[in-house]
Amino acid sequence: MAVFDDVRDVVVEQLSVDPEAVKMESKIIEDLGADSLDVVELVMALEEKFEVEIPDTEAEKLISIADVVNYIEKLGK
């Protein structure tokens, strides 16, 4: 769950949400209250944290925390 922990840390910092609110099934917009600008900033922070590039076409598919974790794990980070 190391990737989840790192993703949670980034989400908590970027969205100013309680760490307990960030679960694998949490939806970034619906559950965590992010708007479109928050999502862009979150993707940029994730790219920096994991040293990856997330194309816009892929970022649009990242709806939940699980989507983010699975995508980053798929990249081998």
Swiss-Prot record:
Pfam families: PP-binding. 4'-phosphopantetheine is transferred from CoA to a specific serine of apo-ACP by AcpS. This modification is essential for activity because fatty acids are bound in thioester linkage to the sulfhydryl of the prosthetic group. One of its GO terms (biological process) is lipid A biosynthetic process. Keywords: Cytoplasm, Fatty acid biosynthesis, Fatty acid metabolism, Lipid biosynthesis, Lipid metabolism, Phosphopantetheine, Phosphoprotein. The modification O-(pantetheine 4'-phosphoryl)serine is found at S36. Belongs to the acyl carrier protein (ACP) family. It comes from the Bacteria. The lineage of its organism: Bacteria, Pseudomonadati, Campylobacterota, Epsilonproteobacteria, Campylobacterales. NCBIfam families: acyl_carrier, PRK00982.1-2, PRK00982.1-4. InterPro entries: ACP, ACP-like_sf, PP-bd_ACP, Ppantetheine_attach_site. The keyword Lipid metabolism applies. GO terms for molecular function: acyl binding; acyl carrier activity. It comes from Campylobacter curvus (strain 525.92). PANTHER family: ACYL CARRIER PROTEIN, CARRIER DOMAIN-CONTAINING PROTEIN. Carrier of the growing fatty acid chain in fatty acid biosynthesis. Its main location: cytoplasm. The gene is acpP. Pathway: Lipid metabolism; fatty acid biosynthesis. This is Acyl carrier protein. Gene3D superfamilies: ACP-like (1.10.1200.10). Residues 1-76 form the Carrier domain. It is found in: Cytoplasm.
